[in-house]
Structure formats: C-alpha cells, structure tokens
Amino acid sequence: MVVGIEGIITKKEPTFIIVKCASGLSYGIFISLFCSAKIQTQEKHEFFITQIIKEDSNKFYGFLDKDEQKMFEMLLKVNGVGANTAMAVCSSLDINSFYKALSLGDESVLKKVPGIGPKSAKRIIVELSDTRTKLENVSDDKSEALAALLTLGFKQEKIISVLASAQATGTSELIKEALKKLR
C-alpha cells in the first residue's frame, strides 16, 4: 500500500498531476482544486496518499493536508459516495465549511457540490453526524492556534478562514502564519 509520495510535479491539470520521484518512477495522482491551487509544476511536494484498488484500476488520491485526506476517507465510508464524489466535495468545500455543514445538518451546503443531490446530501449528513466529535479533533495544532488567536482578540470567523488555508504545521508556525495574514 502506498501512503505517501514525494517528488517533482512534472504535469499539472486542474484535478490531476504527475509526480516524478527521485527513484525515477512517475505517479499519476488525483487531487482537489484546493490542492491544485497551492502547487506549481517543477516544484517538489510531498503528498499524503489514499490508494483505491479495484479489479480494473489502481488510483492514487493525493493531499497536501492530512485533514483533507481524513475528510475524503470519511466521505468514502458513506453509502453511495465514491472517490469521484468525495473528491468533488474536497474540491468544493474547505474543511471548516464541511465540518460546519455536518454540525448544523445543513444539506444545502452539500447540495451545491456537483454530483450531490438532495438524497446524497441527506445521507452524508446522517451517516457522518455521529463522527462530528472525531472531526473536531483532527488537528490539535489548528485548535490550539485558534484558541491562542481568539485570546489575542481576533474574530473567530476570520481565524478559521485563515487557518483553513494555512500551509504551516505545528501550533507556533500556524500562529505566526495566521498573524501575518490577519494584520
């Protein structure tokens, strides 16, 4: 099983890239639009991989952010949601919008995603509603950074928005990056 790939991006389409590794092997990886916006060709990146093997295919789905990968994998557990639909959700909703829709039971947010109708939106809300507490604990670093920035007087909505797009890892790095964007 492949769980990570690091290499130079040699080809980039909106939701598909080819990564050439140091070993000389190149891998085709499906990515979300959010991930695509953060990368360029000829850059070196490391991707968290979810590998899906079927009798007629072996596909890699790549993520720069472990939280987005967890969201993708949770969506795959929903009855009737496949990899394409899960990736459409990852491309349409940032992780905080997704969590908020789940916690509020807001089907209308999910219905805006291409390929998700009323029945699928309801099924996602129902089947993942009990996992909300797990989702809240996905990134302890982001939670700690949120708490620290709140004590500094910043608005929660702005903080969440900034942290959702943050590249840094670790609480202190997240806070530094957020402070630059919030000022």
Curated annotation (Swiss-Prot):
Places the protein is found: Cytoplasm
Single GO MF annotation: four-way junction helicase activity
Query: Its Gene Ontology biological processes?
Result: DNA recombination; DNA repair
What ranges does the record give for the region Domain III, renumbered to this chain?
139-183
Report the GO terms under cellular component: cytoplasm; Holliday junction helicase complex; Holliday junction resolvase complex
Name the principal localization, coarsely classed: cytoplasm
Gene3D superfamilies to which the protein is assigned, alphabetical: 5' to 3' exonuclease, C-terminal subdomain (1.10.150.20), DNA helicase RuvA subunit, C-terminal domain (1.10.8.10), Nucleic acid-binding proteins (2.40.50.140)
Q: Which UniProt keywords apply?
A: Cytoplasm, DNA damage, DNA recombination, DNA repair, DNA-binding
Q: Where is this region: Domain II?
A: 65-139
Provide the transmembrane region boundaries: none
HAMAP family recorded for this chain? DNA_HJ_migration_RuvA (MF_00031)
Biological role stated in the UniProt entry: The RuvA-RuvB-RuvC complex processes Holliday junction (HJ) DNA during genetic recombination and DNA repair, while the RuvA-RuvB complex plays an important role in the rescue of blocked DNA replication forks via replication fork reversal (RFR). RuvA specifically binds to HJ cruciform DNA, conferring on it an open structure. The RuvB hexamer acts as an ATP-dependent pump, pulling dsDNA into and through the RuvAB complex. HJ branch migration allows RuvC to scan DNA until it finds its consensus sequence, where it cleaves and resolves the cruciform DNA.
Q: Which NCBIfam families match?
A: ruvA
Description of how the protein assembles with itself and partners: Homotetramer. Forms an RuvA(8)-RuvB(12)-Holliday junction (HJ) complex. HJ DNA is sandwiched between 2 RuvA tetramers; dsDNA enters through RuvA and exits via RuvB. An RuvB hexamer assembles on each DNA strand where it exits the tetramer. Each RuvB hexamer is contacted by two RuvA subunits (via domain III) on 2 adjacent RuvB subunits; this complex drives branch migration. In the full resolvosome a probable DNA-RuvA(4)-RuvB(12)-RuvC(2) complex forms which resolves the HJ.
* Domain commentary: Has three domains with a flexible linker between the domains II and III and assumes an 'L' shape. Domain III is highly mobile and contacts RuvB.
User: What is the name attached to this protein's record?
Assistant: Holliday junction branch migration complex subunit RuvA
Q: Which organism is it from?
A: Campylobacter jejuni subsp. doylei (strain ATCC BAA-1458 / RM4099 / 269.97)
What's the encoding gene here?
ruvA
